[in-house]
Amino acid sequence: MDLGTTKYIIYTELIADGYVEKHDVIGAIFGQTEGLLSNELDLRDLQKSGRIGRIDVDLENINGKSFAKITLPSSLDKVETSILAATLETIDRVGPCFATVKITEVEDIRVSKRQYITNRARSILRKLMDEMIDTYEITEEIKESLRTEEIMEFGPENLPCGPNVVHSDSIIVVEGRADVLTLLRCGIKNTVAVEGTSVPKSIMELTKKKTTTAFTDGDRGGELILKELLQTCDIDYVARAPYGKEVEGTSKKEIMKCLRAKVPVEQIVGNNCNNSCNVSEVINSNSPEEIVESVTPKYFEKVETPVTEPVFDDNVVEEETVIVEPVKKTETEIIDVDAANESQVDKKFSGVKEIVDSIKNTGNVKFVVDGTEKTNTFKEFLTNIHEIKKMDFFAADMPISQKIVDLLYDKTPIIVGKEINVTKKPVNLRLFSFDEIVA
C-alpha cells in the first residue's frame, strides 16, 4: 500500500450472505455512499483529488458466504475520516446479497511514523556514540604512544628503562617492561627493569654508582626477585607493591604511596648491629629472607610469646618516623630468645592447625567461646552474632574481607581464613591465612 500523504487508515470487515466478487464489493462501496453526504465527501471526488487512496479488498468465499477485509487510506482530518468510516457501515447489500459492514479500527498512521522515527533515531544515535572517539581516549592514546617512545634500552642486555636512568642520581629497579611503562605513566622516568630473576651485570654495576630503590611486586615472585637483588646488587631502599598486587596493576596513587614508604636498608638491618657496623657486611651476614620479611607488609602477626625483655622494637620497620634504640644483647642471648619464642609459637599453633584442618573445604566457620568449640555455617553465625560477646578464636573457610574484620575486631583477638584481603587492621587483632598456619 502506497501511503503517500495518508493520515489515517480505515479497516473494515464485510460479510455477505452469498457468493460475491471483489468488483461487487467495490461497486457497493461507491454506489451506496453516492449522494449520501455532501459533494465534499463523495468518494469518487475524494479519490480523484487524492484525498483518499486506493480501496483494497481481500475477499474469501466460504460455504456460500463471502468475507471481505477492506482498507481505505484517508488524508482527511479526523472528523471527516470518522464521518467517512461511519458512512461505510450503512452498506447493506452487495450485488444480490444482503451484507453487513463493521469498522474494526481507524489507525492514525502518524503514530506509527513517530514510533518508527523514535526507534530509528535511537539506533542512529547509538551507532554515532559507538563510533565517536572520546577526547579522553584520544589524549590517553597520544600519551601512551609518547611513553612507549620514551622507553629506552640500557646495557648490552638491552634492558627496558626510562629516559633518565643514565643521567639521574637515583634509579628504581623493577621487574619487567610493563612496570617501566606503569611508572612512566606516573611521571617516573628513572626506572630500569631486570627482566627476570637473574640480575644482569649491567644492573649490578649501575647500583654501585647510583642511589637505588628496589620496587617489586607484592607476591611470591616479587619476593624472589627482591632476594636476588639484595644478594647481588648495592640496594639503598626497598619498596613493595600492595600485598597480592603487581606493580603494573597498581594505581598511580598506590605507587606513589609505596615509593614514599620505601625502607632504607640501613634501617632494616640496623637493629641487628651497632652504629659502627658496616652496612654491606650486615647485608651479607643477614639472609635475604630476613630482609624481605622486614619490608613485606605485616598481613599477619604471630601469637603472643611470654613476656621477655625485647631485643628490639618491631615497630621500627612499620613506622618510618619512629626509631626505637635497640637493647644491646649478645648474639647468644638473641638466639636463645628466638628459640624459646619459636617453641612457644609451635605449641600454640598446634591447636589452631587442627581447627583449620577440620573446616577446610566445608565452607563453615569455627569459633571458640569460653573454651568451647562451635561450628556453624557463615549464615548461621551472622544470625547469632549479636548473642556472642567475646570469642577466644575465629576461623572461616572463606576469604577474610574488611567487612568481616570490622564486624569481629572487638569480639576476638585472632581471625583465620582462606585468604586475608583487608586494607586496615586494628592493632589488637591478629590475622592469619590457612597457608600461614599450615606452613
UniProtKB/Swiss-Prot annotation:
Protein known as: DNA primase DnaG
Keyword tags: DNA replication, DNA-directed RNA polymerase, Magnesium, Metal-binding, Nucleotidyltransferase, Primosome, Transcription, Transferase
InterPro entries in the cross-refs: DnaG_primase, Primase_DnaG_arc, TOPRIM_DnaG/twinkle, TOPRIM_dom
Signal peptide: none
Role, per record: RNA polymerase that catalyzes the synthesis of short RNA molecules used as primers for DNA polymerase during DNA replication.
Catalytic reaction equation(s): ssDNA + n NTP = ssDNA/pppN(pN)n-1 hybrid + (n-1) diphosphate
Lineage: Archaea, Methanobacteriati, Methanobacteriota, Methanomada group, Methanococci
Residues annotated for Mg(2+) 1 binding in this entry: E175, D217
EC number: 2.7.7.101
Required cofactor names: Mg(2+)
Pfam families: Toprim_4 (PF13662)
Complexes and interactors: Forms a ternary complex with MCM helicase and DNA.
